[in-house]
Amino acid sequence: MPDMDRRTFLAGTAAATTATAVGASRAGAIVKSVSAQVDPRYRGKRHVAVLGGGCGGLSAAHELLERGFTVDVYERYPVAGGKCRSIPSEGTGTGGRADLPGEHGLRFFPGYYRHVIDTMARIPYGSNPNGVKDNLVFGSTARFSRKDALDVPFPYKKLNSVNVITDLPAALVGLLGVIPGLTPAELLYFATRLTEFVTSCDARRDAEYDTLSWWEFVQAERFGSLYQNLLTRSLTRNLVAAQAELASTRTIGLQATRILVANILFSMYDEASRLLNAPTSEVWIDPWLNHLRGAGVNWFPDTTVEGIELQGGAISGVRVSSGGPSRTITADVYVLAIPVEGARTLLGAPFRALDPALTALDDLMPDWMTGVQYFLSRRLPIARGHVTYVDSPWALTSVSQGQFWNRDLSTYGNGAVRDVVSVDVSNWDAPGILFGKPARQCTKDEIFKEIWEQMKISLNEDGVILRDGDIVDRFLDPAIKFGPAGTPVDNAEPLLVNTVDSWAKRPGATTRIPNLFLASDYVKTNTDLATMEGANEAARRAVNGILDLTGWSGSRARIWTFEEPALFAVARAEDRLRYVLGLPHKLSDRRR
């Protein structure tokens, strides 16, 4: 039974129930901001070194710059953006045209995103009244494509269909009932599991649901292949680009709550899915860096962090290299804004002795999830949004980008390109259908051919949609490194997966090393997902820690909580009582 005084709890439950009966409930993944202690050594200090120029690093620099801090940003690549950046396919531009725009993987901006959207609105872009934010366009439809079956369109439309809590399972059944082939029992069971999560308390989500995989939570093994592949795996990939068998129910449930329930059924947020209207670096990352540099940020590209030096329990300097001899850079405060696989290498035993929470970085799991782009000679708007290939062994998701871009694609490459289909590959370990090998054992050419074939068998059921002759060029994220045998040996930019039991292992943005702060997507945040939004929120938390440490008296960087429908506040308070009493959720059919 959870450790809490029941009398204290009951009084709090009654107050919470009354307070949240009207309006939106500020519930779900609320991470308390941990304040750094004002330290006389740092009071009034204003020089910050940001190590990493991806979304987290630039977000931290942005917030600090607006508060008058001197900011130096060090980035290992020649360009900013990290995994968000566009990656030109070198040498493909001819006749004065730009190189073809590749990328790490497709990206979209769900309606519940708040932190990164707020930052985008503060980045000037031409005459846009809302800056870079105005470069987002609505993706109105998801599509689930299946082998030997009709495709399923899933419109992102706002329904406003739930008036009382008992309506929720029926509303979810109606929402998902557009999928042919699922039995009423399967639909109802899945809807009931979603309802269970939506009406659960935060404590249960943190302690119980984080110990369950989404696959286990929805009891996928009890049902047929369509339930497993479409509702369990594909819906998960579409929402969060994660594998249902590995991902924490806490994480998947929160994203489903925000997108399917709060966004679509209750219309609490903006459009469910937004995409950029041109290659990412052109309409977001480059304008962002230009704005920051123009306002005074010092930018050091092609600079690798080799080590962090400690003295007296604090950071005294950072060893970096820009292709020549190592040098030591110094600042008052340091923000580590690199992915977890790099952070845990830099933050070794001396750091962990000062802050034991950093030891758990070793338990966080990055996985191979990366992208391929096919540059086509004709427009191919497969869906006005994401396409999930339900039966693809490599767990594919794609977007036809030309329909969203306001660019003339003939100005790239050799002039023959009219569309770009960007594909994410989420499973590098399952055998393919063309060569019978997992992606990790394929050559680059085999990877291109295998992905294309898996897409073809899902799309070319009622006519030819994908044609081999339409391919002008192809691009694979260069983070995939190939060895002498021609097969992948490393992924330099894997994606963190919120696996079972990972919530408690993720550190906060503030550490016990007074002048070290963390601003990356592995940090514990309300977002609870390795995304641009999560990195931006982590950066804001790091900045607020710096403001506390240095005695800053001005405004803090805003942190959003993600509101959930107030209709469920009473049910969630009831579940909090049940949780404290050691009882399961009243809708749960799992054995404890």
Region locations from a protein language model:
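C-terminal segments that line or cap access tunnels to active or ligand-binding sites in enzymes
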Residues: 265-276, 319, 332-333, 338-506, ...
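Conserved beta-strand-loop-beta-strand element in the redox core of flavoprotein oxidoreductases
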Residues: 309-328
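N-terminal Rossmann-like FAD-binding beta1-loop-alpha1 element of flavoenzymes
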Residues: 46-72
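Glycine-rich FAD pyrophosphate-binding loop
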Residues: 66-87
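Dinucleotide-binding Rossmann-like beta1-alpha1 core, especially the glycine-rich loop
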Residues: 94-189
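Active-site-proximal substrate-binding core of FAD-dependent oxidoreductases
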Residues: 547-591
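N-terminal secretory signal peptides and thylakoid transit peptides that target proteins
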Residues: 1-16
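Active-site/ligand-binding neighborhood in enzyme catalytic cores
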Residues: 189-307, 311
